[in-house]
Amino acid sequence: MNDNREQLTQQIIDAGRFLYGRGWSPATSSNYSARLDEQRALLTVSGKHKGQLGFDDVLATDLAGNSLEPGKKPSAETLLHTQLYAWNPAIGAVLHTHSVNATVLSRLVRGDRLVLQDYELQKAFAGVTTHEGQVEVPIFDNDQDIARLASRVQPWLEAYPHCPGYLIRGHGLYTWGARMSDALRQVEAFEFLFECELKVLSLSR
């Protein structure tokens, strides 16, 4: 294992421990990845507990989502990761989490997007410099056909290239960043904002 791969794999392992510890990636849910180079990514293998990841639980794939390591099966949602790397070469890490807040809020919001507005913490997202604007988070209906789901995500990415993430209804969050630390920061910001939105909804009823 070369130094770069070892470092990126350790970042994925550390991310899993952090996200599991916060309750945002329970049991074997979720999947994480990091860009290895222009043609390859490292992803968590299918069905592994994210708080207990080891070096053997991460594999290399091409950007079409195909495993480059015989005997290792990538997550069923690998294509949603590699789609992002192929779309934007500046993306270096992608995190998919399954928190209670993201799951519940995605089911409560009517329509195809969640609008975050007037929160100071919006500035935690890459490219956002003020609380005064809106951050639109698309919500896609869950689909076991990942290629079909990816085909619905792609037009949004093209139309809104500064979008910091998206939700899958009743499922979870996808967010990304130039580095793993950036993606983790965005997960944490999203989770704070999701909790705020849920509190607002509960108090307004």
Curated annotation (Swiss-Prot):
Q: Which GO biological process annotations does it have?
A: L-methionine salvage from methylthioadenosine; monosaccharide metabolic process
EC number in record: 4.2.1.109
Known cofactor(s): Zn(2+)
- Going by the entry's taxonomy, the superkingdom of the source organism is recorded as Bacteria
Q: Which Pfam families match?
A: Aldolase_II (PF00596)
Which UniProt key words apply to this protein? Amino-acid biosynthesis, Lyase, Metal-binding, Methionine biosynthesis, Zinc
Q: How is the cofactor bound?
A: Binds 1 zinc ion per subunit.
- One GO molecular function term? zinc ion binding
Substrates-to-products reaction catalysed: 5-(methylsulfanyl)-D-ribulose 1-phosphate = 5-methylsulfanyl-2,3-dioxopentyl phosphate + H2O
Tell me the InterPro entries matching this sequence. Answer: Aldolase_II/adducin_N (IPR001303), Aldolase_II/adducin_N_sf (IPR036409), MethylthioRu-1-P_deHdtase_MtnB (IPR017714)
* GO terms for cellular component: cytoplasm
Pathway it acts in? Answer: Amino-acid biosynthesis; L-methionine biosynthesis via salvage pathway; L-methionine from S-methyl-5-thio-alpha-D-ribose 1-phosphate: step 2/6
| Annotated positions binding Zn(2+) | H96, H98
* Protein family per UniProt: Belongs to the aldolase class II family. MtnB subfamily.
Q: What does this protein do?
A: Catalyzes the dehydration of methylthioribulose-1-phosphate (MTRu-1-P) into 2,3-diketo-5-methylthiopentyl-1-phosphate (DK-MTP-1-P).
Q: What is this protein called?
A: Methylthioribulose-1-phosphate dehydratase
